[in-house]
């Protein structure tokens, strides 16, 4: 039995190839059935995200194994083998285990240490459980990777610092406000960055969100997802006073929120502080707003400096995480080798018990026919001894004929000889 990990990711393949190799959720069961129909495959998990498609397999060793699996992948997706080979990586046993642990821990992600990948790996594993997981070693490898990812999160700072603009904006808000559950957040725009911000805020229990956008339809889709209210851009002046936090990211060529607008809002709020995070380029908030008392304005450049600092911290934490992965990989491979020995021990014991039962049955039959008990017992002991030492004796003789002293010593040790 061999463990394999093969696939492509954002580092080895462009999006034009990644999208062709991906497995859609509605076709995943069919793909797993097709994969497990391959004679060498004992168990399989398919991990398919926007940044990677990987197959994790338990297989029987055979000639041309790599070629057979690449051919299956190309046939399934109607791909040119040469195109795929240029971008494909292939990891076996120790390297496959280490790779999965690194993936689950976010060490192989586009955004170093991002937590979402662990959920994606868990879902891929759960999907494989629906009648497709047939190899206990593969199942154990995934369960181990989940505990390793948890350990990396617990024992290092790999996920402690924001390294995306959206996440950094939310982290800044959490640092300034003791609890986000009691604040009102105004989001200006409804593009990808604001979508990410809104989801982060929802995860941190923000109860009231207002989304202001040029087109109501796009904003409404996001609002329905996160439980927000939608307003027009023209309503910002009137509603700004309600917001404790304003996060803005539009494509407007001119500022949307001016100094006068914020002054009026602060007056209505009786100078309760406002946090304004402007992550738009060009800027959505007039820079002069930052000069107002109780208005705390941060630009995308401010966030980038936070991100750069945090990325350096994550890289330092990644060194610690790699040490954990190496240690856990070594422990898993030791367990795997022990499993192999356990199977050999079971076979050896079963063989010995079969010999014992066979000879005991013959001895009992002889006793029932009135044979001499002492002679029957001596015959049983002699035959049992000969049958049990026959195979080890042949191995010792062959090692001696070959002049293989190392094998002789191993056999002596195995047989408990001084």
From Swiss-Prot:
It catalyses: (S)-4-amino-5-oxopentanoate + tRNA(Glu) + NADP(+) = L-glutamyl-tRNA(Glu) + NADPH + H(+). One of its GO terms (molecular function) is glutamyl-tRNA reductase activity. Pfam families: GlutR_dimer (PF00745), GlutR_N (PF05201), Shikimate_DH (PF01488). Gene3D superfamilies: Glutamyl-tRNA reductase, N-terminal domain, NAD(P)-binding Rossmann-like Domain. The keyword Oxidoreductase applies. It comes from the Bacteria. Its EC number is 1.2.1.70. Substrate binds at residues 49-52, 109, 114-116, 120. The keyword Transmembrane helix does not apply. Keywords: NADP, Oxidoreductase, Porphyrin biosynthesis. PROSITE patterns: GLUTR (PS00747). NADP(+) binds at residues 189-194. The active site is at 50 (nucleophile). Pathway: Porphyrin-containing compound metabolism; protoporphyrin-IX biosynthesis; 5-aminolevulinate from L-glutamyl-tRNA(Glu): step 1/2. During catalysis, the active site Cys acts as a nucleophile attacking the alpha-carbonyl group of tRNA-bound glutamate with the formation of a thioester intermediate between enzyme and glutamate, and the concomitant release of tRNA(Glu). The thioester intermediate is finally reduced by direct hydride transfer from NADPH, to form the product GSA. Catalyzes the NADPH-dependent reduction of glutamyl-tRNA(Glu) to glutamate 1-semialdehyde (GSA). This is Glutamyl-tRNA reductase. The lineage of its organism: Bacteria, Pseudomonadati, Pseudomonadota, Gammaproteobacteria, Enterobacterales. The gene is hemA.
